[in-house]
Amino acid sequence: MPLKSFFFSAFLVLCLSKFTQGVGTTEKEESLSPLELNILQNKFASYYANDTITVKGITIGGWLVTEPYITPSLYRNATSLAKQQNSSSNISIVDEFTLCKTLGYNTSLTLLDNHFKTWITEDDFEQIKTNGFNLVRIPIGYWAWKQNTDKNLYIDNITFNDPYVSDGLQLKYLNNALEWAQKYELNVWLDLHGAPGSQNGFDNSGERILYGDLGWLRLNNTKELTLAIWRDMFQTFLNKGDKSPVVGIQIVNEPLGGKIDVSDITEMYYEAFDLLKKNQNSSDNTTFVIHDGFQGIGHWNLELNPTYQNVSHHYFNLTGANYSSQDILVDHHHYEVFTDAQLAETQFARIENIINYGDSIHKELSFHPAVVGEWSGAITDCATWLNGVGVGARYDGSYYNTTLFTTNDKPVGTCISQNSLADWTQDYRDRVRQFIEAQLATYSSKTTGWIFWNWKTEDAVEWDYLKLKEANLFPSPFDNYTYFKADGSIEEKFSSSLSAQAFPRTTSSVLSSTTTSRKSKNAAISNKLTTSQLLPIKNMSLTWKASVCALAITIAALCASL
């Protein structure tokens, strides 16, 4: 076939496939076409030869910073204890801040100490090593540095009023974790997951703030206390050589650019890096980790980069500092479940998003190393309390019945992933496995590494490595793919199971009675408009689709005649 004719035919097939997409019922599932399969195969093959991965990590979230959806029993117990103390029906425990405030010092201390003692033990670290991970990310809150709860006195005699319980409790268990990591030859990445006043309003920062202003860098002493904690972290964990497993320090997790001015976040990053350099010996190679602040990939390329001093000097004079751009690692977090548009995507689109995301990160690597420091197996937001205690799921529409946020989108379907694995359909299992494999194959080939969220939960299976592995939904070893080959290309059998329609969309608003409360991982940014919302292609009329397709065919015919 002449080359021009081939391209014309391929273009026509593609146009017709797009023309028919969305016409008729949305409940019919369509398998990948050979063209779509070839697109994905080519995308994976393009970068797979560049084996850049150094990090194969796991996070032990929900431990030293508690999270309701990871251990809901802890929060149910806290509510029960509060009711015993006070018969008021007004009890609302939604995060660690309100847990400590409601229960008071003694009860909170007993409850949390037992949780720290039992949720993560030495056995977990041994299993993490056995399962093939080489790094453990340990989230910890700023309140671990509280030295006198009665006086709200922190390190460096800084006073900051909050109800958190500490007096060295979290740091004691952190030291245990470092000893276990050293014993089992695991690297550790320390992560300041909660900053004073909350840096994002998510419950995993310690304090859930769904609608109000954030306190970090706004309230008195939040900046001073943050700097004091960073200084202590650097003085404590740098320059230890082989005596310490700490290889990276993430100065703050997920500062929410937009609700916090990005220039303020950037300035804090520079001040933190200056503190690190002042406390770091020339032989120390501990990595300075920054989160992307929810800015686009590539945003931080020129920052903290000695090649671009004209950029850096606006915030800090680092001319005399001896450092390389490779000393600063950018941490990206990626989930596909915290907007309506993501939840409504087809499985093909979801996996293509992952491939494109990896491609974009790969282009960053010449500026700074970059990892996907949080990702999961979740393809819905249905896990109990994922969006917050008392908050529902976007997937079944209950999110909008339990918050002040609104949407024009219909629910995608009925939640099932919050149920026991035994109640999952085989189709749902297949999709979760495919999604996990796509991320492993992409992040292993196109980034500096990955860190899965999370090691374990009580019942949020899509976020639970141990449960996913046990159900054969997470490859073990990590490259033991079902849908991909060792070179990263896609198995042919993927074409029969990877559907072009993620899930049948319900025609009515079917709500699950079991999904009335979820965790607000990204509740504060859930209403940002996505591309599909700004350009609703799927909602085009049939006449408009036909017009567009006719125009495309005309252009293709002209090209073929040249």
Curated annotation (Swiss-Prot):
One term of GO molecular function: glucan exo-1,3-beta-glucosidase activity
Protein known as: Glucan 1,3-beta-glucosidase 2
Misc remark: Present with 2410 molecules/cell in log phase SD medium.
Q: What reaction does this enzyme carry out catalytically?
A: Successive hydrolysis of beta-D-glucose units from the non-reducing ends of (1->3)-beta-D-glucans, releasing alpha-glucose
Which domain of life, per UniProt? Eukaryota
User: Which InterPro entries does the UniProt entry name for this protein?
Assistant: Glyco_hydro_5, Glyco_hydro_5_CS, Glycoside_hydrolase_SF, Glycosyl_hydrolase_5
- The answer to whether UniProt assigns keyword Transmembrane to this entry is no
- Coiled-coil ranges per UniProt: none
The main place the protein resides is membrane
**What are the annotated glycosylation sites?**
50, 77, 86, 90, 106, 157, 220, 281, 285, 310, 317, 322, 401, 480, 539
Membrane topology note = Lipid-anchor; GPI-anchor
* The enzyme's E.C. designation: 3.2.1.58
- Look up the signal peptide feature and give its range: 1-22
Family (UniProt): Belongs to the glycosyl hydrolase 5 (cellulase A) family.
Identify which residues the record assigns to the active site.
E254, H334
Q: Which GO terms describe its cellular component?
A: extracellular region; fungal-type cell wall; plasma membrane; side of membrane
Q: Which UniProt keywords apply?
A: Cell membrane, Cell wall biogenesis/degradation, Glycoprotein, Glycosidase, GPI-anchor, Hydrolase, Lipoprotein, Membrane, Signal
- List, alphabetically, the Pfam families matched: Cellulase
Q: Which Gene3D superfamilies match?
A: Glycosidases
**Might you name a Gene Ontology BP term for this protein?**
fungal-type cell wall organization
